[in-house]
């Protein structure tokens, strides 16, 4: 089973951990978004005495990651869970009584999900409108498209997709589904491409891209999980530990940026990236999908005296 996902900013991430930990240290890493295990493989090779807690909400991805890391199975503990649910009680139930020193969250959708899962994340194939990252649990994209009100559809298209044609697209979907349910990615993509005039299509991008992003975020409640997960993981992180987070679009990055900056102000944390680290030109040539990846890093300098209290940040 060959991996199909590229480990975005892998060299940068490993280098940052190398700068904060000694190579021979028995570092405990937590990969909160395991994917196909590419980043964890770098940690296991780069730190020969380390262990990795491998987490993913998708059992298919977790299985693929474990297969890739089979040579290191004695140093890997796997947990099927959303990273937002990770806390000391969950780790303890899996025999882990220490807090992680290195945490990684890669918030991007994997290549496997887009092109090989058959769950309708991409409009390039005629697939069922599903989009669930945890299979068979919760509402799917077909439910959203065929049951949400016009106003609710318009809201998620505009809020999560930043789509200026949100109102018109929502209106057409509601009228169209009165005749037949919209069940396949190709149906939805074709419908959207007919609504937006071709001369106004975004350069180099299918006009349905923003709507598909909005649906995926809604189905999986991605932004809610990011907020909750950062709060939990930053409190779980061991003193002198480091958390690295990769975001791919402005909605994700805004949450990550503000959360990390607020922690750095209040709770004995040090922001190691005043500005996000971007992929190298070489990496973007090899993997064009990485071009929008922003890496932000925070180090815990001491234990927080009390649980973090959110405050809104208006800093850029």
UniProtKB/Swiss-Prot annotation:
Function in brief: Specifically methylates the N4 position of cytidine in position 1402 (C1402) of 16S rRNA.
The reply on keyword Coiled coil is no
Q: What is its EC number?
A: 2.1.1.199
Task: Output the NCBIfam families linked to this UniProt entry.
Answer: 16S rRNA (cytosine(1402)-N(4))-methyltransferase RsmH
Q: Which InterPro entries match?
A: RsmH (IPR002903), SAM-dep_MeTrfase_MraW_recog (IPR023397), SAM-dependent_MTases_sf (IPR029063)
The cellular location(s) given in this protein's UniProt record come to: Cytoplasm
Keywords (alphabetical) are: Cytoplasm, Methyltransferase, rRNA processing, S-adenosyl-L-methionine, Transferase
**Gene responsible for this protein:** rsmH
Q: Please classify the protein's predominant subcellular localization into one broad category.
A: cytoplasm
Task: Tell me the organism.
Answer: Leptospira borgpetersenii serovar Hardjo-bovis (strain JB197)
Q: Disordered: where is this region? A: 276-316
Q: Which reaction does it catalyse?
A: cytidine(1402) in 16S rRNA + S-adenosyl-L-methionine = N(4)-methylcytidine(1402) in 16S rRNA + S-adenosyl-L-homocysteine + H(+)
* Basic and acidic residues biased stretches: 302-316
Source organism, top-level taxon: Bacteria
The Gene Ontology biological process annotation of the record reads:
rRNA base methylation
User: Which family does the record claim for this protein?
Assistant: Belongs to the methyltransferase superfamily. RsmH family.
HAMAP family xref list: 16SrRNA_methyltr_H (MF_01007)
MF annotations from Gene Ontology = rRNA (cytosine-N4-)-methyltransferase activity
Query: What protein is this chain from?
Result: Ribosomal RNA small subunit methyltransferase H
A cellular component term from Gene Ontology for this protein is: cytoplasm
Quote the record's binding site residues for S-adenosyl-L-methionine. 37-39, 56, 83, 106, 113
């Amino acid at each position: 089973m060959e991996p199909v996902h590229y480990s975005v900013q892998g060299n940068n991430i490993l280098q940052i951990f190398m700068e904060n930990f000694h190579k021979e240290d028995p570092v405990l890493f937590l990969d909160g978004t395991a994917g196909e295990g590419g980043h964890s493989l770098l940690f296991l090779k780069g730190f020969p005495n380390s262990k990795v807690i491998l987490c993913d909400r998708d059992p298919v991805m977790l299985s693929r990651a474990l297969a890739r890391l089979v040579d290191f199975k004695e140093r890997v503990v796997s947990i099927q869970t959303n990273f937002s649910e990770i806390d000391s009680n969950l780790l303890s139930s899996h025999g882990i009584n220490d807090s992680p020193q290195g945490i990684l969250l890669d918030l991007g959708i994997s290549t496997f999900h887009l092109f090989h899962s058959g769950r309708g994340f991409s409009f390039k194939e005629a697939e069922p409108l599903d989009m669930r990252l945890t299979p068979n649990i919760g509402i799917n994209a077909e439910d959203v498209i065929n049951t949400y009100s016009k106003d609710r559809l318009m809201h998620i298209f505009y809020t999560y997709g930043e789509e200026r044609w949100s109102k018109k697209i929502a209106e057409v979907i509601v009228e169209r589904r009165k005749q037949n349910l919209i069940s396949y990615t190709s149906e939805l993509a074709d419908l959207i491409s007919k609504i937006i005039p071709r001369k106004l299509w975004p350069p180099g991008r299918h006009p349905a891209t923003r709507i598909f992003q909005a649906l995926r975020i809604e189905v999986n409640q991605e932004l809610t999980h990011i907020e909750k997960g950062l709060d939990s993981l930053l409190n779980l992180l061991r003193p002198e530990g480091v958390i690295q987070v990769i975001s791919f679009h402005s909605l994700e990055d805004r949450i990550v940026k503000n959360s990390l900056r607020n922690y750095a102000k209040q709770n004995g944390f040090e922001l190691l990236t005043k500005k996000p680290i971007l992929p190298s030109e070489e990496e973007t040539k090899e993997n064009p999908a990485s071009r929008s990846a922003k890496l932000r890093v925070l180090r815990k300098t001491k234990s927080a005296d009390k649980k973090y209290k959110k405050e809104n940040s208006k800093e850029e």
